[in-house]
């Protein structure tokens, strides 16, 4: 039977990872290693200056752990190299995140980092996020569409193989709409996220300052000379966005220009 490792950055008890396990439990043998507490926006942080403690969850056949103060990267690293080192995983899936991971979000994202760590460890990996924008807070959060999408993707991978070669992963964002409103899937490049320089300064009872960094609305800028819809455009039109991400951050287009610039500096 196929074996899938799940992680997230919202924490072991988050609704998203429970929905993810529920969606896949009949398709594969599921293992879960997730942070004990929320680790949103921790990026690729890995713990090397403190010990990590793994708590085995009772009643889960030894396949569930939560990592005290662990990050998503810690969880995947520890799962593959120690906790389940006897298991050959077919997939690592990180999510379902509560909120988008598009554009530059992918640099900050702990959810994407979990999938990146799986890729680094040589396992095909997917990050999946559920958009929350414009959701009526009086309406219960539904993962129905996200569950359908991940089931379809995983089945396609099991049938036809993982579509990417080398150190690459899939980043999936699911619009906040019903199955009836859903328009289909788009293969997209990342868009350009527009961040506001928002900092909220407060004063505590001891008259000392503290700060909250602002949460930003989903605003983006069109990519130049790009005919494809970006991930933001797809979501805005009730499409699922599927974006291939590459771990290699080298700007190859700039190598020759940089060589010329550097030669000039040495004269």
Curated annotation (Swiss-Prot):
Keywords: Cytoplasm, Hydrolase, Metal-binding, Nucleotide-binding. Its cofactor is a divalent metal cation. It is an enzyme of class 3 (hydrolase). A divalent metal cation binds at residues 9-10, 40, 97. Binds 1 divalent metal cation per subunit. Pfam families: SurE (PF01975). The keyword Nucleotide-binding applies. GO terms for molecular function: 3'-nucleotidase activity; 5'-nucleotidase activity; exopolyphosphatase activity; metal ion binding; nucleotide binding. It comes from the Bacteria. Its EC number is 3.1.3.5. Its main location: cytoplasm. InterPro entries: SurE, SurE-like_Pase/nucleotidase, SurE-like_sf. It catalyses: a ribonucleoside 5'-phosphate + H2O = a ribonucleoside + phosphate. It is found in: Cytoplasm. GO terms for cellular component: cytoplasm. Belongs to the SurE nucleotidase family. Nucleotidase that shows phosphatase activity on nucleoside 5'-monophosphates. HAMAP family: SurE. This is 5'-nucleotidase SurE. It comes from Helicobacter pylori (strain Shi470). The gene is surE.
């Amino acid at each position: 039977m196929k074996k899938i490792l799940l992680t997230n950055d919202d924490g072991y008890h988050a609704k998203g990872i429970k929905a993810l396990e529920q969606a896949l439990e009949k398709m594969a043998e599921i293992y879960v290693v997730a942070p004990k507490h929320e680790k949103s926006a921790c990026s690729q942080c890995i713990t090397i200056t403190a010990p990590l403690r793994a708590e085995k969850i009772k009643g889960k056949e030894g396949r569930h752990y939560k990592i005290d103060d662990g990050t998503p990267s810690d969880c995947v690293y520890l799962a593959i190299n120690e906790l389940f080192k006897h298991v050959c995983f077919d997939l690592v899936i990180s999510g379902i995140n509560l909120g988008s991971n598009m554009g530059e979000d992918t640099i900050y994202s702990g959810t994407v980092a979990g999938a990146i760590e799986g890729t680094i460890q040589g396992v095909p990996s997917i990050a999946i996020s559920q958009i929350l924008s414009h959701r009526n807070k009086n309406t219960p959060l539904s993962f129905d569409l996200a569950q359908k999408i991940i089931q379809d993707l995983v089945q396609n991978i099991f049938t036809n193989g993982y579509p990417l070669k080398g150190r690459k992963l899939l980043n999936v964002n699911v619009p906040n709409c019903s199955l009836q409103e859903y328009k289909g899937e788009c293969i997209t490049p990342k868009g350009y996220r527009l961040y506001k320089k928002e900092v909220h300064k407060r004063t505590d009872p001891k008259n000392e300052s503290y700060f909250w960094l602002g949460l930003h609305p989903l605003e983006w800028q069109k990519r130049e000379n790009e005919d494809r819809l970006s991930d933001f455009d797809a979501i805005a039109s009730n499409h699922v966005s599927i974006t291939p991400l590459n771990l290699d951050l080298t700007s190859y287009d700039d190598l020759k220009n940089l060589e010329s610039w550097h030669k000039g500096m040495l004269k």
